[in-house]
Regions:
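Active-site beta-loop-alpha junctions enriched in small/polar residues
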Residues: 46, 92, 140-142
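Conserved strand-to-helix beginnings and helix N-cap segments that scaffold or border functional pockets
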Residues: 120-123, 147-151
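Short, conserved acidic/polar surface loops in the N-terminal third of protein domains
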Residues: 52-56, 97-99, 121
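Residues at the starts of beta-strands that form the adenosine-phosphate
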Residues: 1-3, 39-40, 106-107, 132-135
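Internal catalytic-core helix/loop-beta-alpha segment
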Residues: 69-117
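Histidine-anchored nucleotide/phosphate-binding helix
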Residues: 30-36, 120-130
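A short glycine-rich beta-strand->turn/loop micro-motif centered on a GG-aromatic cluster
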Residues: 109-113, 133-147, 165
Length: 166
């Protein structure tokens, strides 16, 4: 059994406050991956409160984004019909994510945004929690803050035996 984790495919990371052309470019591929996936699908949502700028993350990245219940926080329209199983997370990685992996899962595939922040954080949490589980990153369905940071994150994950599907 496989599980697909779609990381932070939210409006603010695609066309909003922290959006990019690279993020926009992966949307069709992520839609195709989700539509054709035979297994459990989990979406993560970066979720902040109106006091975001007063948090440690907000002080270091002073751009309001993914404020709960705003348009920017929502999963993009193209993926919204498939986002039935969502987990909200207050930071880059979700410590609750490992508990959502069912017994009998033999592979977890991750895609989404941003490769160098939330994708790598969640992949590393899963790798630490399940060292024998095959964890795969679908690199074509990920985008980083920059293309260079995307590549660096993929290299870092490869170094800890996370599979990278180019």
């Amino acid at each position: 059994m496989k599980t697909l984790i779609v990381v932070d495919m939210q409006n603010d990371f695609i066309t909003g406050a922290l959006g990019s052309k690279d993020a926009e470019a992966i949307v069709p591929g992520v839609v195709e991956l989700v539509k054709g996936f035979d297994g459990k699908i989990i979406f993560t949502r970066d979720t902040h409160t109106p006091n975001y700028l007063a948090t440690q993350e907000g002080r270091k990245l002073p751009v309001e984004h993914c404020i709960k219940d705003t348009h920017g926080w929502q999963i993009c329209d193209e993926l919204k019909p498939y986002a039935k199983n969502c987990i909200d997370k207050i930071t880059f990685g979700s410590v609750d994510l490992p508990s959502m992996i069912d017994d009998g899962t033999d592979e977890v595939i991750l895609c989404g945004l941003c490769t160098d922040i939330c994708v790598i954080s969640n992949a590393m949490i899963l790798k630490a929690h399940y060292p024998e589980l095959k964890i795969t990153i679908d690199a074509a369905c990920c985008a980083g803050v920059t293309r260079e940071s995307h590549k660096i994150a993929l290299d870092a994950m490869r170094a800890v035996q996370i599979e990278i599907k180019e």
